[in-house]
From Swiss-Prot:
Regions of compositional bias (Acidic residues) in chain numbering: 206-248
Quaternary data: Regulatory subunit (R2) of the histone H2A phosphatase complex (HTP-C) consisting of PPH3, PSY2 and PSY4.
Underlying gene: PSY4
Name recorded for this polypeptide: Serine/threonine-protein phosphatase 4 regulatory subunit 2
Organism: Kluyveromyces lactis (strain ATCC 8585 / CBS 2359 / DSM 70799 / NBRC 1267 / NRRL Y-1140 / WM37) (Yeast)
Alphabetized InterPro entries for the sequence: PPP4R2
Length: 402
């Protein structure tokens, strides 16, 4: 009996839920059915049908008792049913059909939604139609006011034809579509019949113009790209020429500087020898060590200049300002102050030879061959030994003595 203890309640619920017979609500008064139904869903269902735990689900049992009390006070005393009475009977008759055994909380929530209402239930008016025969459908039942005699049928056909003409008003649009389908266009407002052909020709001309414009734009883009490539090639060639000119100018400037230095050195040497009264050829034939060193150093400088001229300077060497300084041996040693003197003053001073160089000479030679360079241009007298020693002394040694 689905846990229902009252046989009378079980029969009523079976008739309502299974047979769908709602006349049972008219046979029994609400004051009798609602108290029995409330006791069943508030006490029997939670304790005997669901898995009830007193420690954890005592609150749910209290909520069901409040619902049963609400139905008795709100509807049973007024002898009325709530409008959800059919759904309440379904949940109370077979609760496990809708909820699992361990879902007592869901059952309580569903009962609260059905019981906490204010609207009363009212019986349905009229007779229930089972709709067993398809001809009993309203859409298939013939209309009563239409008669089926022959006269009415003739008049009905004329009436229907009038209705179709009124409803199917198209205001000439259908005829216009039919004419277009035939391939002819009767344009009365324009005054010519070949309007469609003219439009086709215009579209073709527009397409040709667009194609020509696209072709011209493509050609212009190709020409611009070629011009840019040519300009870039010209710029690269100009840059290479500028770099080559700069390197040539640098090499020419170095050659000119080296020539000026050689000329100045040669002029100083020639002037000094001329002022001393000794020809250049005789000076070069001297067997002294100083003359040999001067000639060899001059030849080495010329070889070095030729090697520098033969080599072309690279562009990257322009940033290298740490040039190597070469020390030139002029054949005589003097102080920096005397080296800056003009040529006339420099010539007036007597030429001096380092004692280190003079000491390396062969002692077997006579004094005349060693002091040949100390002959005065005004007289042919030889310089005394004391004067020779004084002249051959280095200025640096005099400074140390002081």
């Amino acid at each position: 009996m689905m846990g229902i203890k009252s046989r009378h309640l079980y029969d009523r619920l079976t008739k309502i839920v299974i047979d769908k017979d709602l006349s049972a609500f008219n046979e029994i008064s609400p004051s009798q059915l609602i108290p029995q139904l409330s006791e069943h869903f508030s006490i029997t269902i939670p304790k005997e049908i669901f898995n009830y735990n007193e420690d954890q689900e005592e609150d749910l049992l209290h909520r069901l008792k409040e619902l049963s009390r609400y139905l008795v006070v709100k509807f049973a005393k007024r002898d009325k049913y709530p409008f959800t009475i059919q759904r309440i009977c379904e949940l109370s008759y077979h609760p496990l059909q809708y909820f699992p055994v361990h879902s007592l909380q869901k059952f309580v929530s569903a009962m609260e939604k059905c019981c906490l209402v204010n609207t009363d239930w009212t019986p349905r008016l009229g007779k229930e139609c089972p709709n067993t025969n398809p001809m009993e459908d309203v859409s298939l039942i013939p209309i009563e006011w239409i008669r089926t005699n022959k006269e009415d049928e003739k008049s009905l056909q004329a009436f229907i034809s009038k209705i179709e003409t009124i409803v199917a008003v198209n205001f000439g649009y259908d005829d216009f579509d039919d004419d277009n389908e035939d391939g002819t266009d009767h344009d009365i407002g324009r005054g010519y019949d070949n309007h469609g052909d003219v439009l086709i020709e215009e579209y073709e001309e527009m397409d040709e113009e667009f194609e020509d414009e696209d072709y011209e734009d493509h050609e212009d883009e190709e020409e611009d790209e070629e011009d840019e490539d040519n300009d870039s090639d010209v710029d690269e060639m100009e840059a290479e020429e500028v770099e080559e000119d700069a390197s040539d100018d640098i090499s020419i400037g170095e050659i000119a500087e080296n020539d000026d230095q050689d000329n100045a050195h040669t002029d100083v040497t020639d002037t000094q020898l001329k002022y001393n009264g000794v020809p250049i050829e005789e000076e070069l034939r001297l067997s002294s060590t100083s003359s040999v060193l001067s000639v060899s150093s001059h030849a080495a400088n010329e070889d070095e200049n030729e090697s520098i001229l033969s080599r072309k300077r690279n562009v990257t060497e322009l940033d290298d300002y740490q040039y190597k300084e070469t020390k030139e041996n002029d054949g005589f040693i003097t102080t920096p102050k005397k080296s800056k003197m003009p040529l006339n003053e420099f010539g007036s001073s007597s030429s001096m030879v380092s004692p280190v160089v003079s000491n390396q000479e062969d002692p077997s030679r006579n004094d005349d061959s060693r002091i040949n360079t100390f002959i005065s241009p005004d007289t042919t007298n030889s310089v005394t030994q004391a004067e020779k020693n004084e002249l051959s002394t280095s200025p640096l040694q005099d400074k140390k003595r002081m």
